[in-house]
Each structure stands twice: as C-alpha cells, then as structure tokens.
Swiss-Prot record:
GTP binds at residues 404-411, 450-454, 504-507. One of its GO terms (cellular component) is cytosol. Residues 94-307 are annotated as: Disordered. Residues 429-433 are annotated as: G2. Residues 395-564 form the tr-type G domain. Residues 94-159, 166-219, 272-285 have a biased composition (Basic and acidic residues). Keywords: Cytoplasm, GTP-binding, Initiation factor, Nucleotide-binding, Protein biosynthesis. Residues 404-411 are annotated as: G1. It comes from Klebsiella oxytoca. Residues 450-453 are annotated as: G3. It is found in: Cytoplasm. Residues 256-271 have a biased composition (Basic residues). This is Translation initiation factor IF-2. SUPFAM superfamilies: Initiation factor IF2/eIF5b, domain 3, P-loop containing nucleoside triphosphate hydrolases, Putative DNA-binding domain, Translation proteins.
Amino acid sequence: MTDVTIKALASEIQTSVDRLIQQFADAGIRKSADDSVTAQEKQTLLTHLNREHGSAPDKLTLQRKTRSTLNIPGTGGKSKSVQIEVRKKRTFVKRDPQEAERLAAEEQAQREAEEQARREAEEAAKREAQLKAEREAAEQAKRELADKAKREAAEKDKVSNQQTDDMTKTAQAEKQRRENEAAELKRKSEEEARRKLEEEARRVAEEARRMAQENEKNWTEAPETPEETTDYHVTTSQHARQAEDDNDREVEGGRGRGRNAKAARPAKKGNKHAESKADREEARAAVRGGKGGKHRKGSALQQGFQKPAQAVNRDVIIGETITVGDLANKMAVKGSQVIKAMMKLGAMATINQVIDQETAQLVAEEMGHKVILRRENELEEAVMSDRDTGAAAEPRAPVVTIMGHVDHGKTSLLDYIRSTKVASGEAGGITQHIGAYHVETDNGMITFLDTPGHAAFTSMRARGAQATDIVVLVVAADDGVMPQTIEAIQHAKAAQVPLVVAVNKIDKPEADLDRVKNELSQYGVMPEEWGGEAQFIPVSAKAGTGIDDLLNAILLQAEVLELKAVRNGMASGAVIESFLDKGRGPVATVLVREGTLHKGDIVLCGFEYGRVRAMRNELGQEVLEAGPSIPVEILGLSGVPAAGDEVTVVRDEKKAREVALYRQGKFREVKLARQQKSKLENMFANMTEGEVHEVNIVLKADVQGSVEAISDSLLKLSTDEVKVKIIGSGVGGITETDATLAAASNAILVGFNVRADASARKVIDAESLDLRYYSVIYHLIDEVKAAMSGMLSPELKQQIIGLAEVRDVFKSPKFGAIAGCMVTEGTIKRHNPIRVLRDNVVIYEGELESLRRFKDDVNEVRNGMECGIGVKNYNDVRVGDMIEVFEIIEIQRTID
C-alpha cells in the first residue's frame, strides 16, 4: 500500500485535518498536515482508536419496576387499596482480562492444592491399613508364642511334679504367682501400645477426610463474583413486604426466582436482611417469644438496653441564657430534678423560665456535670472581624446637629442655609422626624441633622446627639432658655459634643443677647468672651444675618476637632430614621461614618439585613456610593430597622442573616427574662391593687421615630387608675391585621400621618371601631388625655349650702328634741346630710329628719328665717350649737 498524506487521509475518512493530527498525537505519532502516513502508522492509530472508543462497556445495569395493588382491612370493616411498587436493580460488571487470568491461576492453584491433599489422605490411609495389618500379625504371633509357652510350662510342671514329688505345695504356688504377674504386665503393655497406634491412625484419617470434604465443597460451590449485586427490597410495612413476595412469585414463579425459592438456597454472603417472608416471621417470633411465657433464645434483632451502673457525667455546653427545660435535656435528666436542684440552691423556677449563665453553671456543677461556657456572640464577632476597613484616614465633613426649643427657628435656619422650604412641608410648622442634609459651602461640606424640638422627641434628639460631631444650639433672643433648650444642653454634654450657640431672631426689637448669655451660663454654657468654650453667634433666619459667621464657626470647630475617617473599605454607620414605603418597602436613612457604602453591598442593620438595591440622597436622586458623613436613603432591607441601630457592611449574606436571626432570638429571650423578673417583683403590688382601667391603643405612624416618640408620650400619661397600653405599633398604613387586633383587644386605632387601606376600613365599619387620624402630636396627646379622663372615677366634694344657729330646744313626742333655729347663711334643705357643731367642733354627723316653719313641713328655709329642725337619731342638741347643712357633688377629674 502506498503512503498517503495527512490531508488525503483526512478527506478519505471524512474528518478534519486538525482532529486527525490530534488523534495521531494521542497515539504517540507526531505528524503535520503535509506528512505522509505509512501502513504501520495507520495500524497503530487504528489500535489506539479501538482501545479508546471501540471497547465494550465494562458495566451493565438492568432495572425493573413492577406495580401491584393490595387490599388491606381497615377500621369499620372497610377495606383499603394500597398501591405497591417494587423496584429491582441488577448490575453486571465485565471482568478485566488480567483479573480473569488471576482468578484462573487462583483456581488452578486451588485444584492442585486439593489434589495434593487428596493424595496425602490416600497415602495416610494406606499407611494406616498396613500398620494395622502388621499389628494384627504381631499380636497373632505373640498369642501363639504365649500358648506354646503355656503348653511347655504345663509339660515341664507335669514332669517336674513327677520327678520332684518331694517339693512342697508352698513353693509351687509362689512360682505360679510370679509367672502370672509377668504375663499380666506383658499383656497390659501390649494393649496400651495398640490403643495409641489406633488413636493416631484414626486422627490422621479424620483430618484427611475433613480437608477433602472442604476442598470438594469449595470446588463445587461457585464463588460470588461482582457480576450480580445483591438487591434490597426495603419496605416499611408488613403488608408491603407481603405484597412484594406475592408479586415476585407471580412474575418469577416459573423460573424459580421467587423469594420462597431463594429461601431454599443457602443465603448469600453479606445479605443483611431476611430473604423471605418466613425468615422475617421467624425473626419477629423470636423477638416476641413463644406462647405460654416460654421465650425463645434472644434474637440478634432484639434490642438490649441495660441501665447504667452509675451516673453519667456529661460535658454541658451553656450559652449566655438557657431555659430550665433545655438545661435538663443537655444533662439527660428530667426537668423536675433540675427544679429540685435549683430549690436546694434557693432559686424558684419553672421549666420554661430563662435563667442566666451563672445560675445554670451552679446547677449543672451541683449535679456533677462538667460545664463548658460559650459566648453566644461568637458568630457576630467573627462576621464583624471579617471586614475590610481600609487603612489610611482622611479628613471628613463635620456632622452638625441643630437643637433647641420648639418654634425657636431651627428648621428656618437650616432652610435658609439650604435655600429650600423644608418648614412649609411640616405639619403644624414643627419638625416631626429627623431630616439629614449635606450642603456645600465655600469653605467645605457640612452635614446637618435637624432634630425636633418638642419634648416628645427626646429619644430622637438623643440619637441625633450620639451621631453628631458638633451641636448648634438655637436659642430665640426674645424667648431665652426654655425646657427643651436645657434638655438639648444635657444631651450634648452627655455625648461630650462641643456646642455652638446660635442666638436666633436677633432682628426682633425685644431681642436681648445678654439675657441669653446669662441664662445659658447658669447651665454651664459659657461664652468665649467670658472665658468659656462656647461660640455665641447672633443670627437671623429670616434676614440671613450672621449665617456666614455661623458656618465659619462650625468649620473652625471642626478644624479643631481634626475629624478624620477611613474613606476606602467596607462602610459602617447609623440609622437616623426608618419607615415603610408602600411602593419601595422598608426605607432607612443612614448616616455613613466610615468607609464607602456602595449599591449592592450586603448590610447588617440591627435585627434586619439585606442587599442595598438602591440609594438616594436627600433630594431623591439616585446615587451609587456614599462616603463618610453623607446621609442616604437605602432600600432592600428585610424589615424596618429601629432608629439608632448600627449599620455594618459584611461579606456574606448568609452569615448576615444568621446574625440578624440570632439578635432577634436574643432580644426575645432578654424580653421574656425581663417580663419574668417584673412579674416576681410586682407580685404583691399586683395582689393589692384594685381595678385599673386601661386605654388600649393600636398605633401606626409614617416613620419609626414618630412611633417611639408617641409611644413614650402616651405611656407617660398613665396613672394609678388609668393606664395607657400600646397593644400594637408599627410603621406604615393601617392594615386589616391592625384593625382585627384593635377589634379583639377593644382598642383605639390611631394613625399618625398614615391612612387605613380598603380591607382595614371594611373591618373598621363592621366592628364599629374608633379610628382617629392625626398629623400633629399635640392633638393626639390631648384627645388621649380626654379619653383617659372619661375613665377616671369622679371626685366627690362636700359643699356647704346652709348654716343655722340653735336658739331654743323643745320636745316633740314624735321626733324627740326639736331645735328652734335661725338660718344665718345659705339655705337649709330637707333630707340633706348635716353636721352638728359645738364650739366649732363637729360632734355629730347625720341627716335632717324634720324641717318645719310654723307647724308646716317645708322643703327648704332661706337665709334670715326661723325654722324647727329635727335631727335623725340625735337628741343632744343644745342652745348655741350650729347646724351645718351640706351636699355631696361629683367633680369630673382630668389628666394633667
């Protein structure tokens, strides 16, 4: 055959040149497109391709599925059909040629060993037969010799007796005895030797026979090969197993492969299950035992449990908190034993009560176990430590919080700085949640936080002070220091934040700057010109006077503080405000402290977590990142976080979810522990207090800060007689769930800047619920006060309506002593309660029984007129006494 090139061969076999070159290379032949190919090289390539692709499969798997229906009896005599499906799988593996050769060699060696053993057994049997024949011949010769010796001895004795008649009978008897003893010893020695030889021959023959039988058995039984794997029918019901057996007999009955046929053959090695229904029944019977109390031998399937001989000491892992029931489970004891141990230690507890780590450690060690204390925030610490926080710190913009009393012009001042109209959008002209803004000035950027000035927003203002670098205290020049001004000073001092005082409304005629300085100096805010540290800047939010000086003072104070932050790396910050938007979901206003917050980052925020889906600045514009001191609104959290929560960017969303769930569980445990503690502490107070009226409220507001402020204000209204109870609160509109909760708890639905949806209004109309909307917190508090006032029991007041002087006393057979009186003040009315005064001391308190004027009964007697008064059940009336008539009136109480 002539040689062809690679190209020609590729076109001939209809494949690409590159693939053919690669196949030659795999076969170990290096060729190019223009090289020629010899017949030998073609044969080499063909052999390689057959070995790679033409080989038969090494393994073949057969699967079979059969279905059947089984009717089983049920309750009430009804039968129930159960669908049974049996799946079988058999795998046949092709032997490797080398493996086949090895198995053949092993079989040949085994046959040779068996043949050698058989020959050795035959030779041993022949030797044993020969030895036996020799022994029998020797014994026969010995017996003949013994008989001959006896006959000769008898003849000698006869001759000797004839020749020696004079021998005595005693000598003959002695000689006979010695001869008998010698013969007996010889016979015993011969029998012992013969017995040993027979036993040795029998043992050798038995061993040879046993080896031959084992070899024959191993030769006749085919060894188990991997060609057929064991099929397991694992069922979970007696009926299913029975149906499986019946189905096998129907399908494979002619071929003898049913389960009962399998049971007749020896069981395969390694089969862990019973091969037939009979085997399973036998195993169950062995476990149950026979009739009449005669139990069979214990089965291997029967579980044997023995009580421990002594107490088992365990390693008990205890977290920061644990319930009594969980502690008992960890120690493998009953909960009552743990409660007894705690009672011995002087602590009372229930099985579901949460106990602290120290108490659990004492109880576990008292019961003899080893305690391993575990910190439950290890996961949280690990997540927080796995953060790229950057290295180099750069200067950042100051975060400035504007504080002050209500209506002192905080928002108007910031409004002028930002050149926008924020104040006009606030209900009632007051700020009701924190606004975060950053403004660009000629000297740099400043971030402003505008906090409400109303007393109800104390917690919001406290959060603002914690997140800020500088506090601008706005004081009206015409109003001076007010309660919220003092509170703002306290917050700033508690947070150790420097103060810059902006004296607003300086353009008013009644403005008095010195008065403001004097009043603030009483609370530790000293002006710089007086030797203090606070800068006083007179400004006017309307005219714009002193605004530039205020900004310069803020930047100067920031320069002194040397504010720096890491710009690169994973961000961290704080939640300034949060609310639930109907279209966007949970929204949180975040102030970034360090790092850069990017869109798509995974954030952990208190009890919530999520991926930042979108970020907007205070103008509502989309941004992709936010650096230090920049406030942004983020979307994508799992829920509405609490205002003031820490915001941290983490790497793994799964771990962030685990930390958030752990925090939720921890908060719940702490809350339950606190409730339990308050129940124990207030036990006697709850036993002694009378009936207390409650005003139940379901509160919904637009932002989280408003919910907190309103809740705090309403809870402070509670008195000993009427208590305000917030049944439910949240952020967002009033839903059907809120209305149902209010109906179940007889509560008032309060919506602050939110409205009820259609489904909620249906429930409200059907249940006739009290729904109220508010946009100003003053109105809400006033109406709740009015509702509480209606629940107060009225105050009873005694009002004196008349006073009469006793001028004379005379007797009446019907009423006893009658006092003749002159009305000196007011009006005396019949059947009213009276007091009898003697020397201005009350000596009797009772009721008027009779009131007459001139013999006529009258209902009242006016001032300056005489009358006769009969006092009920009292006769010790004297001249000069004063009779005071009064009435009890009810005065409706109010909540101050």
